């Protein structure tokens, strides 16, 4: 959990390698010190990300299948999927009872349906680290139940899930540790 102004955006961008300070400071992720030869793409390959910001970058003419498939490549532009990748996406849509959305364009979906597609996108490559920033924004109770139920049944012991939220009740039961970021002061010392 976090308070507004607590540094959440900076912390997440450090984890994902999107912040220049991720390489300028002594940091390790996945057992490797940053700046020791891994590319940002090596890091991103092990991370599944959902955020309100990423939602803005998707072409609304993309189908749900295309949008979810971009998770294999850590980009927001669709690429050709292998049959194995497409089958993985279809399997997740089936597990989330979303097969009716798979061929629909994002523009023809509600915000909640789009967010579910992006949640599936974060899972397609079975990453070791899931970072979900406000994942349930726009989802109704049934959708949230579907996601949390999936987590209860499918999270692996070697996976880590970081959920960033303002609301304690949105933290899935699969999360067994919590930390509230304190408010940062206006002064940097």
List the predicted regions and their residue ranges.
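A short, proline-enriched helix->beta-strand linker immediately N-terminal to the Walker B motif
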Residues: 124-128
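ABC ATPase NBD Q-loop/coupling interface
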Residues: 26-42
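Helix N-cap at the start of a conserved alpha-helix in ABC-type nucleotide-binding domains
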Residues: 141-142
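ABC-family P-loop ATPase nucleotide-binding domains
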Residues: 51-108
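Catalytic Walker B motif of ABC-type/P-loop ATPase nucleotide-binding domains
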Residues: 130-134
């Amino acid at each position: 959990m976090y308070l507004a102004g607590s540094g959440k955006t900076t912390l997440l961008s450090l984890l994902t390698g999107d912040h220049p300070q991720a390489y300028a400071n002594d940091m390790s992720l996945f057992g490797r010190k940053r700046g020791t030869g891994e590319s940002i793409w090596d890091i991103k390959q092990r991370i599944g990300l959902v955020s309100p910001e990423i939602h803005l970058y998707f072409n609304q003419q993309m189908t749900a299948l295309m949008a979810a498939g971009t998770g294999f490549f850590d980009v927001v532009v669709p690429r050709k999927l292998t049959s194995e990748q497409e089958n993985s996406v279809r399997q997740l849509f089936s597990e989330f009872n979303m097969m009716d959305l798979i061929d629909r364009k994002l523009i023809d979906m509600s915000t909640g349906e789009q967010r579910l597609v992006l949640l599936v996108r974060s899972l397609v490559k079975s990453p070791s680290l899931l970072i979900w920033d406000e994942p349930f924004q726009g989802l109704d109770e049934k959708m949230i139940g579907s996601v949390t139920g999936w987590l209860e049944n499918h999270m692996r012991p070697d996976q880590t899930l970081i959920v960033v939220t303002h609301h304690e009740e949105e933290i899935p039961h699969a999360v067994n540790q919590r930390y509230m970021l304190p408010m940062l002061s206006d002064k940097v010392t």
